[in-house]
């Protein structure tokens, strides 16, 4: 009867109740629609039946649990099969993900002897994580709630906490103590805890008051007592004798990575529940679990796994906070925390832990359990379940890559998996961990380097860091790459500067070049001179050339006003050098005059442009190659280059000014043209309105003087500025507007030019009247910045199509639909249009046959002016569209405009015709 009632109850649930019930069972449902509701109801019915079966099995198991404390287990296979509710092999992930595996694992957990302790532990969840249905969900719910993470006050049992992950709210009633169990004395005396520093502590004088979750802790402690008595005797060895193993016992969630959600509400719900950050760890932890099928075979159980498992659960009971067996505490705290815990634990009394010897939770640096910014650095809960995953310090301590509980593995030097004894590589104590012997894998070291060496990043950066791990770029490489271009540019500039300076320095010493020219006289006269006179003549030319070059150089550098040297001064200069030079001076001068080539010395008469015909006409000698010092040449070159650069810049500025002025003139002409057209439209509206008023009131004159129309349209302060626009509008009306006739009338005793509106026929008036709902052109052109390159979905959401406050009547939305169909008249893929009549943003929803048709409609509508409003379009997901408009599921017939006249496009045709007429005129 109860089963029938439970089966029929889901049919009467509302959408909200159905959603909450599925969430209570650990599922992550999507939107409840007509198509998904039957699937969700069937799933809820099945889960309720499994829940009732588990409750019945738990009650039967609790009655048979009387003498379980003295029972022994025969082998490690039985041990691992019962401790975690008969979980499958580590590689059998498909079994964990299936609903059948969920029910069978839960049932086997209820039947195991460990599942029903003296306090009656709750049912163990099979998969250890939520089941994600194959629908698009609005939430990502892969992490327990803060209440469940707190563990009921910080001391909740492991199985109770694991059960809270999936079957929330299920608690079996406590069973009476068994006859074979110890009922007197302190719990610490009965359980005989072995602290991880190796010394047994006496129990405290008084038991600690139980916390909110102490009942579940006591149940797990009783179970561990029975487990500890049946373990191998080697388990009594101290924990530091064992090797620290990098045991990654993590398995991926039962909801595989393909079951993702692309809903926009997913981010909002995920932020409210705090469940987004752990979900991102699924991709990372799948890679950690790939080594498990070949590394988790059962082997003889060692002291390491046996005693560490026992100490871990016992300390979690009495210490008020669980120390995870495979902690990764170094990612959340410093390495010195382990030493602080060890020193504090070595003090007598254990600090109020009820004889446990562990520090209380308050002595540990406080971190928010399950905080979103810490969650990406922590490992997600494994399917086999850890007894301390949901404790208050669980997220803090679960980041230590060593076995032994707490921070034990941090301070144990030289303990690695490659030196473990043969018996230490067995599977962990009853299903609590699976050891991964790959202690030096690259992924693990990368993870630790990320956790230890980097500060906490914001959530988007953490997501990118976890999903796209790559080698860090060294600061030295980035520094050199940053300054490489600057260094190359500086080197190039220095090279050309040095080259130019060297060139300038070489230009200043041109004597050998000139000497080469002198040695080659280019005629036969030089060969007729005797050999003894040749050397003297060459020496005279050299001396004279150097003197003239020095004088010319001093003049160019501004240190001398004399540029040339007279013939008498040249003769006196050579005479001072020696009497032999004076004798050959005339011969040298004659040779220079007759040679006619540029040998560095030029003969000049009384004027610089005077033609010399005789040697007697030569009055001055001038150097054609001034010899200037290096700094003088550099200064002259700098002045020359600066002068030329200034001229170049001036030319560029003049060109820019000319282009700017031309652009200004073009822009001004375009603006004046636009203002002229606007003025024409205003004049026509005034004349049409005046004509309508004349038909209603016969006393009005059927014409209007031009100055009156101008004064009514242009403000007094703008009339001078708008005079040119007004004159162009008047000329345009006179030449191109047939409905306006210009006449001369006497008004008030003076002659005025007036405009008379000529009434057109009724049929023509109807076609020329611009309707209220019209497309008014494109606001901007579509490009990559404002339009996606590919069509995303077949559904569109259009904004600013109307203003619900200004709309009148009951069928105004039909005009909106008709306008969209007319605008997209060449699109045969629109199958559904919905107008949200109450939307303040003027939203219209459009569904097309395919994303290609939606992209075509997007390009036609986005950025257009409609009824004075700028229309914007965005893509909408198909499932959200069907959730909003279920009737659109069956729409597959393309829609066509009902009116063939295309009234909404008449304004565009009118403007196009006006522009064409203006261009032809």
Curated annotation (Swiss-Prot):
Residues 717-736 bind DNA. Keywords: DNA-binding, Membrane, Nucleus, Phosphoprotein, Transmembrane, Transmembrane helix. The modification Phosphoserine is found at residues 28, 136-137, 140, 261, 263, 287, 412, 787, 921. InterPro entries: INM_ESCRT-Associated, LEM/LEM-like_dom_sf, LEM_dom, Man1/Src1-like_C, Man1_RRM, MAN1_winged_helix_dom, Nucleotide-bd_a/b_plait_sf, RBD_domain_sf. The modification Phosphothreonine is found at residue 893. The keyword Protein biosynthesis does not apply. Residues 217-237, 263-275 have a biased composition (Acidic residues). This is Inner nuclear membrane protein Man1. The lineage of its organism: Eukaryota, Metazoa, Chordata, Craniata, Vertebrata. The gene is Lemd3.
């Amino acid at each position: 009867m109860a089963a029938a009632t439970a089966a029929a109850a889901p049919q009467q649930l509302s959408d909200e109740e159905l959603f909450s019930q599925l969430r209570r069972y650990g599922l992550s449902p999507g939107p409840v629609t007509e198509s998904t509701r039957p699937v969700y109801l069937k799933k809820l019915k099945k889960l309720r039946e499994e829940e009732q079966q588990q409750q019945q099995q738990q009650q039967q198991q609790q009655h048979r649990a009387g003498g379980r404390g003295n029972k022994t287990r025969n082998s490690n296979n039985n041990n691992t099969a019962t401790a975690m509710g008969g979980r499958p092999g580590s590689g059998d992930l498909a079994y964990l993900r299936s609903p059948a595996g969920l029910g069978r694992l839960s049932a086997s957990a209820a039947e195991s002897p460990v599942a029903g302790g003296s306090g009656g532990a709750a049912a163990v969840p099979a998969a250890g994580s939520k089941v994600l249905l194959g629908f698009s969900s609005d939430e990502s719910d892969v992490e327990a709630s803060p209440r469940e993470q707190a563990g009921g006050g910080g001391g909740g049992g492991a199985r109770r906490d694991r059960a809270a992950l999936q079957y929330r709210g299920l608690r079996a009633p406590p069973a009476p103590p068994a006859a074979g169990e110890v009922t007197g004395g302190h719990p610490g005396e009965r359980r005989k805890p072995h602290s991880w520093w190796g010394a047994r502590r006496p129990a405290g004088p008084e038991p600690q008051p139980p916390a909110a979750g102490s009942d579940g802790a006591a149940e797990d402690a009783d179970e561990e007592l029975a487990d500890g008595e049946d373990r191998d005797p080697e388990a009594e060895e101290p924990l530091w004798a064992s090797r620290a193993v990098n045991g990654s016992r993590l398995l991926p969630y039962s909801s595989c990575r393909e079951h993702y959600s692309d809903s926009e509400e997913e981010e909002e719900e995920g932020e409210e529940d705090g469940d987004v950050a752990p979900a991102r760890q699924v991709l990372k932890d799948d890679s950690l679990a790939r080594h498990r099928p070949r590394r988790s075979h059962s082997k003889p159980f060692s002291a390491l796994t046996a005693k560490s498992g026992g100490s871990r659960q016992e300390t979690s009971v009495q210490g008020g906070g669980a120390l995870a067996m495979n902690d990764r505490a170094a990612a959340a705290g410093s390495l010195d925390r382990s030493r602080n815990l060890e020193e504090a634990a070595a003090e007598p009394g254990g600090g109020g832990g009820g004889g446990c010897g562990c520090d209380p939770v308050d002595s540990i640096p406080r971190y928010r359990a399950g905080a979103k910014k810490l969650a990406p650095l922590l490992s997600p809960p494994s399917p086999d379940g850890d007894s301390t995953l949901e404790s208050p310090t669980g997220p803090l301590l679960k980041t230590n890559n060593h076995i032994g509980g707490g921070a034990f593995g941090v301070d144990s030097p030289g303990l690695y998996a490659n030196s473990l004894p043969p018996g230490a590589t067995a599977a962990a104590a009853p299903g609590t961990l699976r050891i991964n012997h790959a202690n030096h894998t690259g992924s693990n070291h990368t993870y630790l380097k990320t956790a230890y060496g980097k500060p906490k990043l914001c959530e988007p950066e953490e997501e990118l860091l976890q999903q796209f791990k790559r080698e860090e770029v060294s600061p030295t490489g980035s520094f050199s790459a940053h300054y490489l271009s600057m260094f190359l540019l500086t080197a190039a500039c220095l090279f050309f500067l040095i080259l130019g300076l060297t060139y300038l320095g070489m230009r200043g010493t041109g004597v050998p070049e000139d000497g080469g020219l002198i040695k080659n006289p280019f005629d036969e006269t030089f060969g007729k001179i005797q050999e003894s006179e040749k050397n003297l003549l060459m020496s005279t030319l050299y001396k004279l050339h150097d003197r003239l070059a020095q004088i010319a150089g001093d003049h160019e550098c501004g240190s001398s006003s004399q540029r040339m040297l007279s013939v008498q001064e040249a003769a006196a200069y050579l005479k001072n050098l020696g009497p032999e030079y004076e004798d050959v001076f005339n011969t040298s001068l004659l040779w220079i005059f007759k040679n006619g080539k540029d040998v560095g010395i030029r003969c000049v008469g009384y004027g610089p442009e005077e033609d010399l015909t005789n040697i007697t006409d030569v009055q001055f000698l001038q150097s054609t190659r001034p010899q200037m010092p290096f700094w003088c040449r550099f200064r002259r070159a700098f002045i020359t280059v600066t002068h030329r650069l200034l001229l170049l810049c001036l030319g560029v500025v003049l060109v820019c000014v000319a282009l700017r002025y031309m652009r200004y003139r073009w822009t001004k002409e375009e603006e004046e043209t636009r203002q002229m057209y606007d003025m024409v439209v205003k004049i026509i509206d005034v004349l049409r309105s005046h004509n309508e008023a004349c038909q209603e009131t016969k006393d009005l004159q059927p014409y209007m003087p031009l100055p009156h129309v101008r004064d009514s349209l242009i403000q007094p302060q703008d009339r001078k500025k708008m005079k040119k626009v007004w004159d162009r509008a008047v000329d345009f009306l006179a030449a191109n507007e047939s409905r306006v006739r210009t006449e001369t009338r006497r008004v008030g005793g003076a002659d005025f030019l007036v405009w008379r509106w000529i009434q057109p026929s009724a049929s023509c008036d109807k076609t020329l009247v611009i309707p209220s709902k019209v497309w008014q052109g494109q606001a901007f052109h579509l490009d990559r910045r404002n339009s996606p390159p590919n069509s995303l979905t077949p559904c569109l959401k259009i904004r600013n199509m109307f203003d619900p406050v200004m709309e009148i009547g009951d069928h105004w939305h039909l005009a909106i639909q008709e306008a969209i169909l007319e605008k997209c008249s060449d699109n045969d893929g629109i199958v559904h249009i919905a107008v949200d009549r109450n939307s303040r943003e003027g939203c219209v929803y459009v569904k097309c046959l395919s994303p290609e048709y939606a992209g075509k409609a997007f390009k036609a509508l986005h950025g257009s002016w409609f009824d004075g409003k700028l229309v914007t379009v965005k893509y909408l997901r198909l499932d959200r569209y069907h959730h909003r408009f279920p009737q659109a599921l069956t729409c597959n017939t393309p829609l066509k405009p009902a009116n063939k006249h295309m009234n909404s496009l008449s304004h565009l045709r009118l403007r196009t015709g006006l522009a064409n007429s203006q261009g032809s005129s």
